[in-house]
C-alpha cells in the first residue's frame, strides 16, 4: 500500500503490512519453534491428520462436507409465473474453502490484469484481432482464442528472456536515451534559412540534463529491413494479394454462381457474403502445441480483406509496416475495357478475362547435319606404333580431323624425357632403364633396319589409301563413306601379313562369325565392297556401322598381336567362368519366343514376363500374407549363369587347335576327375598337401607304380607258367574289385583285415578284450596266415633276385598299371591306405576275412563256457605259432645269401609284425625298375 502524507514535505512510500505497536513494558513474543507449531483452521480449531485411507487432513466439519448437517441436495422450483433461472456453475462452486485457500488446489492468487500488462506487444496482431471481433458473426467471439490457444513461445523467445531481454525491447547493444545530433559537415553548403543552433526541442535537452552519463537503455524494437530481391512486375514496395491465400484460396476475383445480383454487391471483406452458413469467427488451435514446439500450418485458415487497411493514412510512429491496398480500385477501368474486347453475351457464371493469355514462343528444332549419328561413338585408342600407323591414319581420316604434329602435342602427352628434349636439356646418365640398352651395336642396327622397312611399308599403304580417298572426295567435309573406304584400303594392305585362320572373335554368334569370315574372304580377293556384301540387309544403319567397325578392328588389332601372345602365353587347362553372368532363371530360355512374338506383332500374353519371386519373410509378416515359399531360403529372383553379351566379345583371343599330346593328357585328366567324382568321399581321404607331406604314402605309391606294373624280361630263373598264373590272378582281382564297386560302395571291410595287416605280436598279447570276442576258427586263420606269409616271402625273394639279375630294358608299361591304381584308390575310399600288393595271393588274403566275418556272426551267441574254452585254445595256439615263427626265421637266415640282403630283411617278419617306420626303411632298399 502506498500512503501519501500531505503534511510532510517528503514523499514517503511504505510497502507491506506494519507491525502493531507494542505497549509500554510489554516484551516481544518469542517465535514458536517448528516442532511446537500446530495446524489449525481459519477458526483456530485443531486439524486432525487421518490415516492412509483418508489421505490428509479432515475434509470439512468433523469429517463432513462443510456443515454440521452435511451435504443436502439443492431444491429446484419452477412455475409458469416464476421461471427458475439457469444457474451457470463453475469449478469453484464444487470446491471447499480449503481448496480456495492459499495452500489449496485452486488458490486465489494475485494475477496481473491486462490493464497492467505491457502495452508494447505486437500491434499488428492486436489490430487484426479487433477487426476480426468487430466483423465476426458473433461479436467478441475472438476472445475465446485467448482462453483456448496456449502460449506460442519459441525456443529463441525463451533464450532471450533468460538472457535479460524483455518483451517490447529491441535486440542489440544498449544505448542512451536519445542519440546526439550529428553536427553538420562545415564543408557542406546550405541553401535557404539557417536552422537555430540549439535545436527546437529545448524541453528534451532539459530532460537529458537530469540523466546521468552512465545510464543506458535497451534499443528500440524496430522491424528489420527485408532484403528480399524483387522478382515481380509490381511497383516498388507494392505487395499484392496472393490468390492462393486471399479470398478463400480462389485465384482471381471471387464470384458467386448462385446469387442473382451483380458482382458489386459482393462483400469486400469476404467473411459472410460467400457462404451464409459458415461461421468464420473462431480459428486457431485448441491444444497440443507446447512452448518448445513449432506450430503446424493451419490448413483451415481463411484470408479476408478485413485484416488489411483499405484507407491510406499516415504511418503510426514505431510501426514500420505498410498497409495493403485494395485490388478492387481498378474495377472501373476494367469495366470500360470489357466492351472493347468482347462483343456478345457472356454466359452466366463466367466473366471475361482481364488479361489475354501469354502465348508461348515456339522455337524451331535445330537442323541436323548430314553425318549426324544419334548415338555417340567412342573411337578406339590405339598406341602409336609401327604396326598400327596405318590404323591411326584411318581413324584420323574417318573422324575428319588431321593428325596432330608431334611438336604441337599437349603437355599431358609428353613425358619428362621428351619435355627435356624440347627445352634443350642434357639428359642425365643413369642406370639403363630399358632392355634395348643392353643390346650390342650390331643388334641395334639390325633392329633399326627392320623398323625402317616396316615404316616404309606403312608409308606406302598410307599413301595408297590417301590417293584412293582423294580421288573420290569433294570440298565438303569427309562423310562416313569416305572413312569406311579408307578402312577397306588399310585392311586390304595389311591382310597379307596377318593369319586369321584360327582367330574367331565372334564364335558365340555363328551368323556374325560367318559374315566375318565372308568379309575376310572378300578382302583377300580385293573386292572394294566386301563389307557391304556380307552385312545383313535387315539391320539398321547404326548396327551396320557398328558391325563394320568391329570387323575392321578385329582384323587389324588382333591378327598382328596373335603371334606375340601365342609366344608368351599358353592355353588354359580349365574353362574360365568369367564369361557368364547371373540372370533370372525364368529369363534363360524365353528370348526366342518373345522375339518371334514381337516380329509377328502379337503383343499381350506372349510378350509378358512371369517371374518366380521369393519375398522376404519379414515382408510377408508386415503385409500379413502367407509366405508362398515357406521352405525357401532364397530372397528375390532365382538366378542361373549364362553368357554375357557385350559389343567387345571379340576381344578375347580364342584357343588354337591343341596338339594330340595335349588332347590325350586332357582326356586322361578328365577321366581321372570323373573317376574321383564317381566314387563316394570317405573320411580317410586326404588332401593333396597332406599326401605330399606324408612320406610313407609317398614311398608306397612309388613302390606301387614301379614294382607293381613292371614285367621283368623272361629269364631262366622265372617260370613262364608262374607268370601266367600271377597275371590271371591279378586280372581276376581287378575284375572283382570293379564289380564290387558297381554293386555297392557303402560296405566297408571288417576290422580283422586291418588287424591282420597292421597289428603286431605285442598288441595281440595285450588285447584281452579282443580275445574274448574270438571264435573257433582262429586255428584255421593262423594256418592261413602262416601259409600266406611264407608264400609272400618266397615270391618277394624271387622277385628281388630277378630284378637284380636282369638288366633294365626299355619296355612300355603294361596296361595293367592304371587298372591296378584305380583298384587301390577304390580300396582307400573305405579305410586307411593299404600296403602295396607284391604277390598274387592277395585275393586269398582278402577272401579270408569275409568268411571269418560270416562265421563270427554265427558264433556270437554262444555261452561263456565255450568262450573260456576258446580262450585256452588260443593261448596254446599262440605258443605254437610263436615257436613256428622263430623256426622259420632261423631257416630263412641260413638259406639266404649275402647278395639278397634286402629281400631277406623284408622276409624276416610278416606284414603283421612290421611297424610303419620299418616298412618304410625296407621299401627304400627295394630294387626298383628304371624306365
From Swiss-Prot:
Annotated region (Disordered), positions in chain: 1-41, 72-92, 169-213, 567-594, 659-931
Start-end of Acidic residues biased regions: 1-12, 202-211, 769-780
The protein's name in its UniProt record: G patch domain-containing protein 1
Keywords linked to the UniProt accession: Acetylation, Isopeptide bond, Phosphoprotein, Ubl conjugation
InterPro entries documented for this protein: DUF1604 (IPR011666), G_patch_dom (IPR000467)
Residue stretches of biased makeup (Low complexity): 896-905
Compositional bias per record (Polar residues), positions renumbered to this chain: 72-81, 659-668
Phosphoserine, modified sites: 6, 8, 358, 479, 715
PROSITE patterns, sorted: G_PATCH
Disulfide pairings: none
Cross-link Glycyl lysine isopeptide (Lys-Gly) (interchain with G-Cter in SUMO2) placement: 313
Domain G-patch: start-end pairs: 152-198
GO BP term, pick one: mRNA processing
Bias kind Basic and acidic residues: ranges: 582-593, 669-695, 781-792
Domain of life according to the entry: Eukaryota
Key word Acetylation present: yes
Species of provenance: Bos taurus (Bovine)
GO function term, MF aspect, one: RNA binding
Residues where N-acetylalanine is found: 2
Gene Ontology terms: cellular component: nucleus
One Pfam family named in its UniProt record: DUF1604
Family of the protein in this entry: Belongs to the GPATCH1 family.
UniProt biased composition (Basic residues): 852-888, 922-931
Amino acid at each position: 500500500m502506498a500512503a501519501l502524507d500531505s503534511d510532510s514535505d517528503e514523499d514517503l512510500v511504505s510497502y507491506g503490512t506494519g507491525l502493531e505497536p507494542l505497549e509500554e513494558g510489554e516484551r516481544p513474543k518469542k517465535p514458536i519453534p517448528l516442532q511446537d507449531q500446530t495446524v489449525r483452521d481459519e477458526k483456530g480449531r485443531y486439524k486432525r491428520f487421518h490415516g492412509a485411507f483418508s489421505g490428509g487432513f479432515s475434509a470439512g466439519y468433523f469429517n463432513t462436507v462443510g456443515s454440521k448437517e452435511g451435504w443436502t441436495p439443492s431444491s429446484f422450483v419452477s412455475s409458469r409465473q416464476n421461471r427458475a433461472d439457469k444457474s451457470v456453475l463453475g469449478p469453484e462452486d464444487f470446491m471447499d474453502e480449503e481448496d480456495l485457500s492459499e495452500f489449496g488446489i485452486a488458490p486465489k492468487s494475485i494475477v496481473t490484469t491486462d490493464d497492467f500488462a505491457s502495452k508494447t506487444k505486437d500491434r499488428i496482431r492486436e489490430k487484426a484481432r479487433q477487426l476480426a471481433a468487430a466483423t465476426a458473426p458473433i461479436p467478441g467471439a475472438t476472445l475465446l482464442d485467448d482462453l483456448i490457444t496456449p502460449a506460442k513461445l519459441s525456443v529463441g523467445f525463451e533464450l532471450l528472456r533468460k538472457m535479460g531481454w524483455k518483451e517490447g525491447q529491441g535486440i542489440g547493444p544498449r544505448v542512451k536515451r536519445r542519440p546526439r545530433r550529428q553536427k553538420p559537415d562545415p564543408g557542406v553548403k546550405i541553401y535557404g534559412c539557417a536552422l537555430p543552433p540549439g535545436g527546437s526541442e529545448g524541453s528534451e535537452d532539459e530532460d537529458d540534463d537530469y540523466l546521468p552519463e552512465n545510464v543506458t537503455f535497451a534499443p528500440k524494437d524496430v522491424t528489420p529491413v527485408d532484403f528480399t530481391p524483387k522478382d515481380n512486375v509490381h511497383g516498388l514496395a507494392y505487395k499484392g494479394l496472393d490468390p492462393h491465400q486471399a479470398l478463400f484460396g480462389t485465384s482471381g476475383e471471387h464470384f458467386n454462381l448462385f446469387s442473382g445480383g451483380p458482382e458489386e454487391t459482393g462483400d469486400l471483406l469476404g467473411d459472410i457474403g460467400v457462404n451464409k452458413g459458415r461461421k468464420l469467427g473462431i480459428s486457431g488451435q485448441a491444444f497440443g502445441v507446447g512452448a518448445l514446439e513449432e506450430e503446424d500450418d493451419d490448413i483451415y485458415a481463411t484470408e479476408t480483406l478485413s485484416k488489411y487497411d483499405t484507407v491510406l493514412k499516415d504511418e503510426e510512429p514505431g510501426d514500420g509496416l505498410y498497409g495493403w491496398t485494395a485490388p478492387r480500385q481498378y474495377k472501373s477501368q476494367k469495366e470500360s475495357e470489357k466492351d472493347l474486347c468482347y462483343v456478345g453475351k457472356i454466359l452466366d457464371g463466367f466473366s471475361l478475362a482481364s488479361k489475354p493469355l501469354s502465348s508461348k514462343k515456339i522455337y524451331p528444332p535445330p537442323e541436323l547435319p548430314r553425318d549426324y549419328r544419334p548415338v555417340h561413338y567412342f573411337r578406339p585408342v590405339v598406341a602409336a606404333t609401327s604396326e598400327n600407323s596405318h590404323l591411326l591414319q584411318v581413324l584420323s581420316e574417318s573422324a575428319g580431323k588431321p593428325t596432330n604434329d608431334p611438336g604441337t602435342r599437349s603437355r599431358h602427352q609428353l613425358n619428362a624425357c621428351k619435355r627435356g628434349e624440347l627445352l634443350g636439356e642434357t639428359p642425365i646418365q643413369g642406370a639403363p632403364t630399358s632392355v634395348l640398352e643392353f643390346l650390342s651395336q650390331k643388334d641395334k642396327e639390325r633392329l633399326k633396319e627392320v623398323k625402317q622397312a616396316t615404316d616404309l611399308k606403312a608409308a606406302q599403304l598410307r599413301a595408297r589409301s590417301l590417293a584412293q580417298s582423294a580421288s573420290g572426295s569433294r570440298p565438303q567435309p569427309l562423310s562416313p563413306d569416305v572413312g569406311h573406304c579408307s578402312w577397306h584400303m588399310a585392311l586390304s594392305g595389311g591382310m597379307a601379313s596377318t593369319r586369321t585362320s584360327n582367330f574367331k572373335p565372334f564364335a558365340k554368334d555363328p551368323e556374325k562369325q560367318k559374315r566375318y569370315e565372308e568379309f575376310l574372304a572378300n578382302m583377300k580377293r580385293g573386292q572394294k565392297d566386301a563389307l557391304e556384301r556380307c552385312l545383313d540387309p535387315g539391320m539398321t544403319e547404326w548396327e551396320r556401322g557398328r558391325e563394320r567397325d568391329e570387323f575392321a578392328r578385329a582384323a587389324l588389332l588382333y591378327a598382328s598381336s596373335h603371334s606375340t601372345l601365342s609366344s608368351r602365353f599358353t592355353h588354359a587347362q580349365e574353362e574360365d567362368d568369367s564369361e557368364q553372368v547371373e540372370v533370372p532363371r525364368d529369363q534363360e530360355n524365353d528370348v526366342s519366343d518373345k522375339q518371334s512374338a514381337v516380329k509377328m506383332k502379337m503383343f499381350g500374353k506372349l510378350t509378358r514376363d512371369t517371374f518366380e519371386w521369393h519375398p522376404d519373410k519379414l515382408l510377408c509378416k508386415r503385409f500379413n500374407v502367407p509366405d508362398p515359399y515357406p521352405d525357401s531360403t532364397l530372397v528375390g529372383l532365382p538366378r542361373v549363369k549364362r553368357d554375357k553379351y557385350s559389343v567387345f566379345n571379340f576381344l578375347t583371343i580364342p584357343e588354337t587347335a591343341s596338339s594330340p599330346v595335349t588332347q590325350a593328357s586332357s582326356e586322361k585328366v578328365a577321366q581321372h576327375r570323373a573317376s574321383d567324382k564317381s566314387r563316394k568321399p570317405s573320411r580317410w581321404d586326404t588332401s593333396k598337401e597332406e599326401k605330399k607331406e606324408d612320406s610313407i604314402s609317398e614311398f608306397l605309391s612309388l613302390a606301387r607304380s614301379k614294382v607293381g606294373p613292371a614285367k621283368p624280361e623272361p629269364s631262366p630263373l622265372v617260370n613262364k607258367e608262374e607268370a601266367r598264373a600271377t597275371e590271371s590272378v591279378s586280372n581276376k582281382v581287378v575284375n572283382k574289385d570293379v564289380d564290387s564297386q558297381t554293386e555297392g560302395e557303402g560296405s566297408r571291410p571288417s576290422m580283422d583285415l586291418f588287424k591282420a595287416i597292421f597289428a603286431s605280436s605285442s598288441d595281440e598279447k595285450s588285447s584281452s578284450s579282443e580275445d574274448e570276442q574270438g571264435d573257433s576258427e582262429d586255428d584255421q586263420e593262423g594256418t592261413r596266415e602262416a601259409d600266406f606269409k611264407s608264400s609272400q616271402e618266397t615270391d618277394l625273394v624271387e622277385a628281388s633276385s630277378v630284378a637284380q639279375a636282369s638288366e633294365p630294358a626299355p619296355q612300355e608299361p603294361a596296361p595293367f598299371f592304371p587298372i591296378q591304381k584305380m583298384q587301390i584308390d577304390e580300396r582307400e575310399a573305405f579305410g586307411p591306405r593299404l600296403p602295396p600288393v607284391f604277390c598274387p595271393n592277395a585275393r586269398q588274403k582278402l577272401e579270408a576275412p569275409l568268411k571269418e566275418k560270416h562265421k563270427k556272426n554265427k558264433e556270437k551267441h554262444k555261452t561263456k563256457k565255450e568262450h573260456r574254452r576258446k580262450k585256452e585254445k588260443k593261448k596254446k595256439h599262440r605258443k605254437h605259432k610263436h615257436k613256428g615263427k622263430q623256426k622259420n626265421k632261423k631257416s630263412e637266415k641260413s638259406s639266404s645269401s649275402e647278395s639278397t640282403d634286402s629281400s631277406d630283411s623284408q622276409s624276416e617278419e610278416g606284414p603283421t609284425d612290421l611297424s610303419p617306420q620299418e616298412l618304410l626303411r625296407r621299401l627304400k632298399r627295394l630294387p626298383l625298375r628304371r624306365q
